[in-house]
């Protein structure tokens, strides 16, 4: 996230969001470890939706597997985010289940180990189907 929560959506700029965020998170992991935090206790969140444009968010998702290079679990949270509404018909947050599931499954395919979701049962069902699809002969 660039800036503060009040200003994070005001013209965010990245040269290439996935690489810029990777470098930032790499520095933060190093700082955490220097402060005594064991690497196995760290997970990262590339911040989908926080101080990002729709284009930035799509870049992050399409390049999510890059973050495996950090050597820590990836948390991905796009459930009900405004990006879904901007890509579709402008639905309110409580009507973004389909988009939330689509983004979660894309993150799962890229190897995200942790998904932050609102609709747990629906996501579990979608993950079961996605897992079967990925592992079918």
What spans do the regions from the language model cover?
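Active-site-adjacent loop and "lid" segments of alpha/beta metabolic enzymes
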Residues: 1-31, 35, 51-137
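Short acidic capping loops at alpha-helix termini that bridge into adjacent secondary structure
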Residues: 39-41
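Short strand-loop junctions, especially beta-strand C-caps/beta-turns
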Residues: 47-49
């Amino acid at each position: 996230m660039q800036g503060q929560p009040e200003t994070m959506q005001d013209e965010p700029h990245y040269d290439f969001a996935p690489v810029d965020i990777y470098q930032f998170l790499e520095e933060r992991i190093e700082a955490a470890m220097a402060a005594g935090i064991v690497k196995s206790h760290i997970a990262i969140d590339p911040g989908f939706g926080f101080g990002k444009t729709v284009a930035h968010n799509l870049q992050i998702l399409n390049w999510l597997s890059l973050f495996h290079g950090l050597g820590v679990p990836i948390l991905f949270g796009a459930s009900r985010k405004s990006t879904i509404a901007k890509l579709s018909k402008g639905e309110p947050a409580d009507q973004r289940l389909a988009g939330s599931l689509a983004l979660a499954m894309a993150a799962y395919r890229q190897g995200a180990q942790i998904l932050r979701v609102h609709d747990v049962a629906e996501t579990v069902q979608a993950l079961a189907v996605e897992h079967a699809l990925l592992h079918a002969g």
